[in-house]
Amino acid sequence: VYRTYPQAKMLCICDMPISQQEQVAAYLGYDEKDLTFKYFGLNHFGWYTNIYNKKGEDLLPQLREDVLSGKVTGLSASQDAGKLDDYWFKTFNNVIKGFKAYPDFMPLCYLQYYYFHDEMMEQFDHEFTRADSVLAGREITVYQECKRVIETQSAKDSYLISGVHGNYIVDLASSIINDKRERFIVNVMNNGAIGNFNHDAVVEVPCYVGASGVEPVAVGYIPQFHKSLMEAQKGYEKLAVEACLEGSYDKAL
């Protein structure tokens, strides 16, 4: 989108960081809004480096200790957990598994596909993919519930909760309209936010959002391990975009 419409006013966001932050905050005994999460990465591909409370105390070392000692083995599910399938419960639990395997930083949940690639592939069913699972489950129940709400003209007692991502979008829009300059994790042009990563790459970092736009927080230099993983992922992404825009079979391959 940046390449095709460079002047477009847009924000690219994902609900996964805020979902995971709420789960972590609940485990630590805090409201998510009372914590400041330091984070860097790409969309669906990032790490938490620090978690500060309002006293300026970093809570990530304690979380790391709890993970390594076996005190915590998984994260609780999000607000509408009652309607989530086993995939999400396993995914949330794999956050802790990934953190234990690589304890420098806490990974975003989707890193399960990169940290545990062989294991995930062994569990993959070519005859019934994740997309098939959603179509056969979540999509049907959501449409059924929406139909019920329309027929009864009431959303009372509905199990469908806008939850984390819905509130996140509203909070972000409110920050823009009212120039609150609140902090959100957003996908933006790097432009030096991550000092040792391509400046023209889109990265996912904390930003202050207000009426005048988005101001990324300086992350600084990141470790070589995480940088290398990001470069491999970004290389694929850039080639995929170029293949699409140029109609190039070679780049797609």
Predicted segments — roles?
Residues 1-24:
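Rossmann-like NAD(P)(H) cofactor-binding subdomain of soluble oxidoreductases
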Residues 20-253:
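Long, compositionally biased stretches enriched for glycine and/or charged residues
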